[in-house]
Amino acid sequence: MDKGIIFLAAGGTGGHLFPAEALAHELKASGYAVHLVTDSRAERYAGKFPAEEVHVVPSATIGSKNPIKLAQSVWKLWTGLRAARRLIARYKPRAVVGFGGYPTVPPLLAATGMGVPSLIHEQNAVMGRANKMLASRVQAIAGGFLPEGTGAFAAKTVTTGNPVRPAVSEAARVPYAAPHGGPFHLVVFGGSQGAQFFSKAVPQAICRLDDAQRQRLKVTQQARPEDREGVTAAYDKLGIPAEVSPFFTDMAARIASAHLVICRSGASTVSEVSVIGRPAILVPYPYALDHDQAANAAALAAKGGARVIAQAELNAERLAGILSDAMNTPDALAQMAANARETGKPDAARLLASLVEAIASGSTVAKFKEARS
């Protein structure tokens, strides 16, 4: 059954594309054709994204105070807006859904200007800059961590949770096995683009563990390309079996195999760790403009599903102590895993797809909320 085309617009990083991918699978299963509107960075993820077509639209970040760079950004956004208008005129999508990042601005501005039903999904507990620009123009705002009852846009906000990909749903079927004295699998990653801080801190911390604990360890670590060789050499020197790579296509399965996860706290990361149900040490990215990662981490920690430590407070000695305690208290890890799973929203993609269908058919958020209650 062909219900028409839905445009999904997302910035080209995993944090934006992963929830868009999850929604795409749900919409396709419901009979919609999905087109992805994004930037050139999305190429590494395109293989698993179930889009009929992928459209790369020019866009730019507006943040520079340099007048020349500012003019270049404005021109690029204007070029992207014209391109997005042509796409909408050609394909006539039933709705346009934005997932954040500046590449969503041209297609969402085009949609709202041309009368196409539109909504945005905000993954974080704090709304990002691109979504803030669009919030007043769209018909609905779906939130991963945004509360429904507060803020200027409360009337059109629906807390759906963050959609997780089918691979995450599959990984969530694997029960957590508390490591009672046996091998201990540590999984370390920093979001889709890696984290340089972990490349130094984690090997240095493991170096400080006693021999018996190091002999139990197996490490899977995401590292940036420029750090990969150094991280691999550090683990080789310690005799730690380690798999180090800039990108893992099967990250969900690797999280499921972990006894403990150390990671950043982007919205998709927190949502996936929660749905899979694994204990985590969350280290929020300290340079985020809106401190959104700290807010995301706090939401999971409040339920006992993670421990949050600021990067400025985490040195090798402290991390070694945390790892040692974790390896010696498997029952506490199991409880943390159970708490994380309880906070997860495995049906977020289905709920978001229902909201998209409602908006595409001309309904309102008020009617959607009434039907849910």
From Swiss-Prot:
<dbReference type="GO" id="GO:0051991">
    <property type="term" value="F:UDP-N-acetyl-D-glucosamine:N-acetylmuramoyl-L-alanyl-D-glutamyl-meso-2,6-diaminopimelyl-D-alanyl-D-alanine-diphosphoundecaprenol 4-beta-N-acetylglucosaminlytransferase activity"/>
</dbReference>
<dbReference type="Pfam" id="PF03033">
    <property type="entry name" value="Glyco_transf_28"/>
</dbReference>
<keyword id="KW-0131">Cell cycle</keyword>
<comment type="pathway">
    <text>Cell wall biogenesis; peptidoglycan biosynthesis.</text>
</comment>
<dbReference type="GO" id="GO:0030259">
    <property type="term" value="P:lipid glycosylation"/>
</dbReference>
<keyword id="KW-1003">Cell membrane</keyword>
<dbReference type="GO" id="GO:0005886">
    <property type="term" value="C:plasma membrane"/>
</dbReference>
<dbReference type="InterPro" id="IPR007235">
    <property type="entry name" value="Glyco_trans_28_C"/>
</dbReference>
<feature type="binding site">
    <location>
        <position position="124"/>
    </location>
    <ligand>
        <name>UDP-N-acetyl-alpha-D-glucosamine</name>
    </ligand>
</feature>
<keyword id="KW-0328">Glycosyltransferase</keyword>
<feature type="binding site">
    <location>
        <begin position="13"/>
        <end position="15"/>
    </location>
    <ligand>
        <name>UDP-N-acetyl-alpha-D-glucosamine</name>
    </ligand>
</feature>
<protein>
    <recommendedName>
        <fullName>UDP-N-acetylglucosamine--N-acetylmuramyl-(pentapeptide) pyrophosphoryl-undecaprenol N-acetylglucosamine transferase</fullName>
        <ecNumber>2.4.1.227</ecNumber>
    </recommendedName>
</protein>
<keyword id="KW-0961">Cell wall biogenesis/degradation</keyword>
<dbReference type="GO" id="GO:0005975">
    <property type="term" value="P:carbohydrate metabolic process"/>
</dbReference>
<dbReference type="GO" id="GO:0008360">
    <property type="term" value="P:regulation of cell shape"/>
</dbReference>
<comment type="function">
    <text>Cell wall formation. Catalyzes the transfer of a GlcNAc subunit on undecaprenyl-pyrophosphoryl-MurNAc-pentapeptide (lipid intermediate I) to form undecaprenyl-pyrophosphoryl-MurNAc-(pentapeptide)GlcNAc (lipid intermediate II).</text>
</comment>
<feature type="binding site">
    <location>
        <position position="293"/>
    </location>
    <ligand>
        <name>UDP-N-acetyl-alpha-D-glucosamine</name>
    </ligand>
</feature>
<feature type="binding site">
    <location>
        <position position="165"/>
    </location>
    <ligand>
        <name>UDP-N-acetyl-alpha-D-glucosamine</name>
    </ligand>
</feature>
<dbReference type="InterPro" id="IPR006009">
    <property type="entry name" value="GlcNAc_MurG"/>
</dbReference>
<dbReference type="InterPro" id="IPR004276">
    <property type="entry name" value="GlycoTrans_28_N"/>
</dbReference>
<keyword id="KW-0997">Cell inner membrane</keyword>
<keyword id="KW-0808">Transferase</keyword>
<comment type="similarity">
    <text>Belongs to the glycosyltransferase 28 family. MurG subfamily.</text>
</comment>
<feature type="binding site">
    <location>
        <position position="192"/>
    </location>
    <ligand>
        <name>UDP-N-acetyl-alpha-D-glucosamine</name>
    </ligand>
</feature>
<keyword id="KW-0132">Cell division</keyword>
<dbReference type="Pfam" id="PF04101">
    <property type="entry name" value="Glyco_tran_28_C"/>
</dbReference>
<dbReference type="GO" id="GO:0071555">
    <property type="term" value="P:cell wall organization"/>
</dbReference>
<dbReference type="GO" id="GO:0009252">
    <property type="term" value="P:peptidoglycan biosynthetic process"/>
</dbReference>
<dbReference type="GO" id="GO:0050511">
    <property type="term" value="F:undecaprenyldiphospho-muramoylpentapeptide beta-N-acetylglucosaminyltransferase activity"/>
</dbReference>
<dbReference type="GO" id="GO:0051301">
    <property type="term" value="P:cell division"/>
</dbReference>
<keyword id="KW-0133">Cell shape</keyword>
<keyword id="KW-0472">Membrane</keyword>
<keyword id="KW-0573">Peptidoglycan synthesis</keyword>
